[in-house]
Design a protein with these regions (language model features):
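FIC/Doc superfamily catalytic core
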Residues: 1-218
């Protein structure tokens, strides 16, 4: 089943153009994937049960969000750690990397997104706002139009699209593919929640709709 094609662009490189998402024909997964999904779902159920016993769940969640923000930011090249963020939060700023701001912006973005979907479905508008919260007060957000869908070509790996490892769809394809993602987010699907989340994340990363910060936003 084709999920898209690499299409030659006028500029001389090939970009990946996603097909309809999700495909009309339901995606089939191996027994190993279904087994992993069942185990993960069971683990989440246990975690939810344990969480009910924690006296101060808000403190637990805030600490977990800090850890998630630090680890995800580290993957993207941030040098600051969760320990640095905790120290900076109480005013101990000596010897803390300047890019600790990336962790705080990520935390703000997560909190913003969680609050936004309490009274509203998850939409492209909210995703853009989350991206803006994450990027707007950081050095890496300078010149990267936080919260705005890209209008130019980006690429992954290499120094230009011609020698890149992967070139996402060109900007003029984004309205269509992002509309598919938004519909998939909010319409009933024949997939378990975890598999649906995995499909959404993979498609979002394939599309790479922002100039930067796609991994953490996705």
């Amino acid at each position: 089943m084709l999920l898209g094609n690499f299409v030659q662009q006028p500029q001389g490189y090939k970009a990946f153009i996603p097909g309809q998402f999700p495909p009309k024909e339901m995606l089939a997964f191996s027994p190993a994937v279904h087994l992993t999904n069942d185990r993960a779902t069971l683990a989440l159920g246990k975690l939810d049960g344990i969480a009910q016993l924690i006296p101060d769940i808000d403190y637990f969640l805030s600490t977990y969000i800090q850890k998630e923000a630090a680890v995800s930011s580290n993957i993207e090249g941030t040098k600051a750690t969760m320990h640095d963020a905790l120290r900076a939060d109480i005013g101990m700023t000596a010897y803390i990397p300047e890019d600790v701001e990336n962790i705080f912006s990520y935390i703000n973005a997560i909190n913003y997104g969680v609050a936004a979907v309490q009274d509203s479905p998850l939409t492209l508008r909210i995703i853009r706002q989350v991206h803006e919260e994450m990027m707007k007060n950081t050095r890496e957000g300078i010149g990267k139009t936080p919260g705005e869908i890209r209008k130019t070509q980006n690429w992954i790996g290499g120094t230009r699209p011609e020698n890149a490892l992967f070139v996402p769809p060109p900007a003029h394809e984004l309205p269509r593919v992002l509309s598919d993602i938004e519909k998939f987010l909010n319409l009933p699907q024949p997939y378990s929640p975890l598999i649906k989340a995995a499909l959404l994340h993979a498609q979002f990363e394939t599309v790479h709709p922002f100039l930067d910060g796609n991994g953490r936003t996705g």
